[in-house]
C-alpha cells in the first residue's frame, strides 16, 4: 500500500458499519483494536455475500497470518463507518485483502490496512489448499484493474 491515504474509488466492495459507544476509549476516539474487528467483518461479509463461505460447513477456510493497520484520522461514536474492500493479491493458497475505513461521507480513508489469509483444509486447519475456483471468481470482482 502506498503511504498516501486511499479514496473510496480505490475499493470495490463496501460495508456500512455503525460505531458503538463501547468502541470509544478513554481518549474519546475508537480504540485501535476495533479497526481489526471491522477488517474481519468486511472480509467475512464479502465471503458470505459472494456465496463462497458457509461458516458451519465450508471445506476450505482462510486463516489470518498477517495484519497491518495505518491510522490517518480519528473516528468516534456516533460516526458512521464504511469499510471498503479490495483484493491486493491472490496467490496459489493465499489472498491479501486490503481494507479502507471511511468516516461518515468522507472520501479519504481514516485508516487503511490489510489481512493476509492462507486457505487451508477445514478438517486439519494446517494443510494449505489452492484457492477454489469460486473464491477466485469472487475475488475477480474486487480486484482493481
Enumerate the predicted regions with their spans.
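Catalytic strand-loop segment that frames the active site of acyl-thioester-processing enzymes
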Residues: 1-49
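HotDog/MaoC-like acyl-thioester-processing domains
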Residues: 1-13, 75-77, 88-145
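Hydrophobic residues in beta-strands and at strand termini
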Residues: 17-21, 71, 119
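Generic structural "secondary-structure junction" signal
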Residues: 23, 29-32, 65-66, 73, ...
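Hydrophobic beta-strand-centered segment that forms part of the acyl-chain substrate-binding groove
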Residues: 46-95, 109-110
Amino acid at each position: 500500500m502506498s503511504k498516501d491515504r486511499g479514496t473510496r474509488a480505490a475499493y470495490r466492495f463496501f460495508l456500512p458499519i455503525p460505531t458503538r459507544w463501547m468502541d470509544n476509549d478513554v481518549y474519546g476516539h475508537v480504540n485501535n483494536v476495533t479497526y481489526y474487528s471491522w477488517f474481519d467483518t468486511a472480509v467475512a461479509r464479502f465471503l458470505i455475500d459472494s456465496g463462497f463461505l458457509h461458516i458451519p460447513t465450508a471445506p476450505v477456510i482462510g486463516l489470518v497470518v498477517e495484519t497491518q493497520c495505518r491510522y490517518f484520522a480519528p473516528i468516534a461514536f456516533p460516526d458512521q463507518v464504511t469499510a471498503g474492500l479490495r483484493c491486493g493479491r491472490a496467490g496459489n493458497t493465499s489472498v491479501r485483502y486490503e481494507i479502507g475505513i471511511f468516516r461518515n461521507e468522507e472520501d479519504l480513508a481514516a485508516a487503511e490496512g490489510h489481512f493476509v489469509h492462507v486457505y487451508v483444509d477445514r478438517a486439519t486447519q494446517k494443510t494449505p489448499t489452492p484457492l477454489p475456483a469460486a473464491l477466485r471468481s469472487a475475488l475477480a470482482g474486487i480486484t482493481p484493474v
